[in-house]
């Protein structure tokens, strides 16, 4: 079911004037699937007119069985056998994000909750990128949008730790080495990004500090 986010959501909740929003999400999902990215399979769009120009929407999607999102996996890392394949999950995640960028798709909200993982029959792992609402396929995605996706994902890791300080007081299941491993794998698959990435990350600490301040002031 579609809902507005932020302050708009508190006012308009699940009422929309834009009748094409779910159709655009369907289009991006189909483009992602054609590009080899595992994502949500949309089987139907339900559109209900409320009054005047306002509508409510529902997407009917095929369930991704036996999967878990990365927030749940990290919160219960000690209990989940899948976490033992952490290195493989990181590599597959880097590949999935790179594949998405290779077909020029920018994810509007790439964070841990929108990444699903599951075991495959061969003993490996499969990574799904979901919730492509408001995402867009560009003619050329460009380096800045790629980095915006990657930094958004990294910030969600930091945010998870900050919000669960008591749980992670002794150790956090994602180390700096893990974060570097993700970047190295992504660069390995996208060699054109090596030089601009080095320059971009020089200002990363300052950018990161600003986002942490915003979370403290604005509550995330």
Residue ranges: model-predicted function:
Residues 111-119:
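Conserved protein-kinase catalytic-loop segment immediately C-terminal to the catalytic Asp
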Residues 50-54, 120-126:
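Short, solvent-exposed loop/turn segments that connect beta-strands within catalytic domains
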Residues 69-80:
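AlphaC helix of the protein kinase catalytic domain
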Residues 1-70, 98, 102-103, 195, ...:
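Conserved ATP-binding subdomain of kinase catalytic cores across diverse folds
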Residues 124-213:
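C-lobe/activation-segment region of protein kinase-like
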Residues 102-112:
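Catalytic-loop of the protein kinase fold
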Residues 4, 112, 134:
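Short, glycine/acidic-enriched loop or turn micro-motifs at the edges of active sites
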């Amino acid at each position: 079911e579609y809902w507005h986010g932020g302050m708009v959501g508190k006012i308009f909740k699940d009422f929309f004037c834009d009748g094409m929003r779910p159709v655009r999400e369907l289009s991006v999902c189909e483009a992602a699937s054609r590009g080899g990215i595992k994502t949500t399979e949309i089987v139907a769009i339900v559109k209900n007119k409320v009054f005047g120009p306002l509508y409510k929407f529902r997407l009917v999607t095929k369930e991704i069985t036996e999967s878990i999102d990365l927030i749940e996996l990290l919160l219960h890392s000690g209990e989940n056998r899948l976490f033992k394949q952490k290195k493989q999950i990181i590599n597959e995640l880097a590949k999935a994000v790179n594949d998405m960028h290779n077909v020029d798709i920018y994810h509007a909200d790439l964070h841990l909750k929108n990444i699903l993982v599951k075991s495959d029959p061969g003993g490996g792992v499969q990574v799904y990128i979901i919730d492509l609402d408001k995402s867009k396929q560009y003619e050329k995605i460009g380096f800045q949008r790629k980095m915006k996706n990657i930094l958004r994902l990294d910030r969600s890791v930091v945010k998870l730790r900050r919000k669960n300080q008591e749980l992670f007081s002794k150790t956090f299941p994602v180390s700096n080495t893990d974060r570097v491993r993700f970047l190295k794998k992504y660069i390995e698959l996208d060699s054109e990004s090596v030089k601009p990435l080095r320059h971009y990350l020089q200002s990363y600490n300052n950018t990161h500090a600003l986002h942490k301040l915003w979370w403290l002031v604005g509550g995330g």
